From Swiss-Prot:
The protein's name: NAD(P)H dehydrogenase (quinone)
Miscellaneous comment in the UniProt entry for this protein: Catalysis proceeds by a classical ping-pong bi-bi reaction mechanism. Was identified as a high-confidence drug target.
Designated gene of the protein: lpdA
Species the sequence originates in: Mycobacterium tuberculosis (strain ATCC 25618 / H37Rv)
Signal peptide span: none
Catalytic activity from the UniProt record: a quinone + NADH + H(+) = a quinol + NAD(+); a quinone + NADPH + H(+) = a quinol + NADP(+)
Length: 493
């Protein structure tokens, strides 16, 4: 019997789910992906891949600024910036990634339909569902499905009094159409997206002002990490309005005017709105299958991505779980394995590593320090500045640190934070420790290359060790050694 699967949305959740179905059950599944924005979704075409490509280009200026300290006297101002070339590279790479994913899906026998999908069941509670796909030219097709995965993603949140025009008032998806650098960029919002673009544009020499709703940037990230980033921003001349919310953003003759709720104003040439996202859950016909949207119009799912409607799953940013491509992809895979009757392990959010791609990068995994400080989790903590690391000194790295958290009684690693130029890579050993419940002693006994930035992770683990950890490890080692010794039991005559 063939299981017919229709996936609404071709982003990480959608295409990963399609690949799972097509590769694990190729003889018994018929997979269709309906997508109106392009395979890869916003993560590949508009958000994650483009922004990180843009950041990679601007990062070259970071190295140039460090060059004089390393004996290379390069005139920083001679590094001419071709913004059209940078943007062309961003768009080319995103399109190529989308094409690669599309080709992979097609090679696996997945049907890809360009259009918008909508559930058209005649009544709630049906075991099989009907979906209508509407193409850009208005033509339609209908499809039956035993399993439906809603993976429609999210879009930039729009402030009614700050309508983006694609010229001066922008969302992060419109930046790559600019022909020239802003004379003065105002970034409204200081979360992950806002912080990343503040960092990138200051590296390009653009004066930047930030309107932050909290008393520091990155309000939902590690407080010490946010402080390091604020210091880095201050060194580059970033002007920061704290505890400020934008009431409106309007066009002026020369640019834009941002008016805050407390009456303060700031003028600039361009405004970038980074005030969060809203789920793409309207117009999908969800009410026809008995699904009611939850808070913020997100789809409510359980830990294996099921909705309350039979045979209908949801994954990715439309569920509001965590706005990360890695989480969306994992949700999609879990949903499809479960739908096909495979055993699955529910997603564990405490094992998800995330990175803010600023300079320095900020990466974290597991239990945050704020939870520990609040007394909710009994833990030991360590914070080791990166400036003590020999490799960091060699490269003139002045900002950053490594944090590790472990359970007070057992020494099991439960979380950590890395602030460093390549924190997105360095967080992996801590994430592995959290995932596999490794102790700080086991992490400390791992031999790190010298000199290396990863050496700070093992050094932090050593400093976090307690005498009880050593006693437990000694007993464990003795038991393991004993197990290796042949035991010749006496035999009776």
């Amino acid at each position: 019997m063939v299981t017919r699967i229709v996936i609404l949305g071709g982003g990480p959740a959608g295409y990963e789910a399609a690949l799972v179905a097509a590769t694990s059950h190729p003889e018994t599944t018929q997979v269709t992906v309906i997508d109106c924005d392009g395979i890869g979704g916003a993560a590949v075409l508009d958000d994650c891949v483009p922004s990180k490509t843009f950041i990679a280009s601007t990062g070259l200026r970071t190295e140039l600024r460090r060059a004089p300290h390393l004996g290379f006297h390069i005139d920083f101002d001679d590094a001419k910036i071709s913004l059209p070339q940078i943007h062309a590279r961003v768009k080319t790479l995103a399109a190529a990634q989308s094409a690669d994913i599309t080709a992979q899906l097609l090679s696996m026998g997945v049907q890809v339909i360009a259009g918008r999908g909508e559930l058209i069941d005649s009544t709630p509670g049906l075991a099989r569902h009907r979906i209508k796909a509407t193409a850009a030219d208005g033509s339609t097709s209908e499809h039956e499905a035993d399993v439906v995965l809603v993976a429609t993603g999210a879009s930039p949140r729009i402030l009614p009094s700050a309508q983006p025009d694609g010229e001066r008032i922008l969302t992060w998806r419109q930046l790559y159409d600019l022909d020239a650098l802003p004379d003065h960029l105002i970034v409204v919002g200081s979360g992950v997206t806002g912080a990343e673009f503040v960092d990138a544009y200051t590296e390009l020499g653009v004066p930047v002002t930030v309107v932050a709703s909290q008393d520091h940037v990155l309000p939902y990230e590690d407080a010490d990490a946010a402080l390091v980033l604020e210091e880095s921003f201050a060194e580059r001349g970033v002007r920061l309005f704290k505890n400020a919310r934008a009431a409106s953003v309007t066009r002026t003759g020369a640019g834009v005017l941002v008016t805050m709720t407390d009456g303060r104003t700031v003028e600039g040439s361009h405004a970038l709105m980074t005030i969060g996202s809203v789920p793409n859950t309207s117009g999908l016909g969800l009410e026809r299958v008995g699904i009611q949207l939850g808070r913020g119009n997100y789809l409510t799912v359980d830990r294996v991505s099921r909705t309350l409607a039979t045979g209908i799953y949801a994954a990715g940013d439309c569920t509001g779980l965590l706005p990360l491509a890695s989480v969306a992809a994992m949700q999609g895979r879990i949903a499809m394995y479960h739908a096909l009757g495979e055993g699955v392990s529910p997603i564990r959010l405490r094992t998800v590593a995330a990175t803010v791609f600023t300079r320095p990068e900020i990466a974290a995994v597991g239990v945050p320090q704020s939870v520990i400080d609040a007394g909710s989790v009994a833990a030991r903590t360590i914070m080791l500045p990166l400036r003590t690391n020999a490799r960091a000194k060699m490269s003139e790295m002045r900002h950053g640190f490594v944090k590790i958290f472990c359970r007070r009684s057992t020494g099991v690693v439960i979380g950590g934070v890395v602030v460093a130029p390549i924190a997105s890579e360095l967080i992996l050993p801590i994430a592995v420790a959290v995932q596999n419940r490794i102790t700080v002693n086991e992490l400390a006994q791992t031999l790190a290359v010298y000199p290396s930035l990863s050496g700070s992770i093992t050094e932090a683990a050593r400093r976090l060790m307690a005498h009880d950890d050593l006693d437990c490890t000694a007993a464990q080692d003795a038991a393991e050694q004993l197990a290796l010794v042949p035991h010749h039991l006496p035999t009776s005559n």
